[in-house]
Amino acid sequence: MHMPSKTNNIFLLSVLLTPQAEKKRQLNVSTHPHIYIVFRQQELTVFMMIMISLLLLASLLPHLTFTARVNVGIVNGTEAKPHSRPYMVSLQKYKKHICGGFLISDEFVLTAAHCWKGYPEILTVVVGAHDFRKSEDSYRVEVKSYISHPHYTFCSLQNDIMLLRLHEKVKLNNNVTWISLPKECEDVKMNTLCSVAGWGRLWMKGPSTDRLMEANTTTIKNKVCKCKWGSDFQASQMICAHGDGGSCIGDSGGPLVCGNTAVGVTSFVDIKGCNSPERPNVYTKISAYLPWIHQIIRNIK
């Protein structure tokens, strides 16, 4: 996760350092906020021990239920129907998810520029995935070329877009295919219901998910976004959206999808929290970069 030096209000949504496998959280009775027990073990009868065990179990049930309920979405999201978004890919470092991305052809992935820190960092792309715990429907592809927008810099919020050329063309099937891009200079209308998806965290400091999650979000007026973000928002290059659900850390690079078209690339959110009510999430506007995208693909082919 990177916090640009130019502002104190922004989080880019990539996982910049390779995350270790998240350890299962263990409940320590003595430090649990709702439980405090002091006793001398030799004074406990079997009956008392049983009663205490039952009381502990009863006190934990609400927390266990809550965990099971919230551990199913990015931010207020729901689990996507398996392979209903066959364009989605996972960008990984040392086989750990750090960012999202999406296929725009059988050879190219579009993602956020801040997801890659430059050589010698090596990323791989996992296609056809839904649940990372089940690998039978997915496979890993090496990246041949990293092509960040020429005007993107690490500390900049602008031009946060990158093409990845895959080392080999993906095999297209029901679980793997690309998504359409908008036409040049085609802007999505405000108040359009769109969606985001990813394998990112469930909240700012929460755990990530093994399953692809999705959430609805609605585009908002540029004037409103400019008022919220100030000079950090550039209407010619960015789109703002907000809703009950939204992107979080690890969702960077995934698409903002309106209809069946990818119109934006997940870029940054308010530092106060993922899907903050104070500031809408910001996406790189794909239509503004179509000439660059098409030129790169033409030159390579």
Go through the PLM ranges and name each one.
Residues 88-92, 192-301:
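Extracellular trypsin-like serine protease catalytic domains
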